[in-house]
């Protein structure tokens, strides 16, 4: 379960609230996508990476208790077994994994920032990233891009190489 939860945050850019609000019907395995119920009742469709589908299926088939809850992620044991996870439960899950892993700065929202930075490094356009993250203003999306000096240098070098191949720098074309 915890792998699937972090996968939705890290590989789909979901907010913790969006993860705990996921229902089984929101997942389209065949289509490879998930319907997200975002802020202010706005919906968006986000693609599901194959690795995340595998983690999701392991959770459903091996861990998720039988329950009438339509929520995808539920409590696995104890008196609240089968009830939907809460924000508090997500915080406890992350606290537990920080403790056993020694990674002190891992939190749900940092995974969303990592998603934004990784997608940018992979070359996704800013308007596309904005849609995936459920933003209505590109300025908000820019907060998640997290460009580092090396990222800027790499992009600059790619642009220079592109100009060279078009012979603009060499002065033969303008």
Labelled PLM ranges:
Residues 1-16, 42, 67:
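Basic, Lys/Arg- and aromatic-enriched nucleic-acid-binding interface segment
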Residues 12, 16-17, 21-55:
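Conserved tyrosine-mediated DNA breakage-rejoining catalytic core shared by Y-recombinases
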Residues 159-174:
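C-terminal secondary-structure termini that scaffold catalytic or DNA-interacting sites
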Residues 50-103:
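Active-site/catalytic core of tyrosine-dependent DNA strand-transfer enzymes
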Residues 7, 11, 112-136, 143:
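C-terminal catalytic core of tyrosine-transesterase DNA break-rejoin enzymes
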Residues 83, 108-109, 144:
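Catalytic tyrosine of NAD(P)H-dependent dehydrogenase/reductases that use a Tyr as the general acid/base
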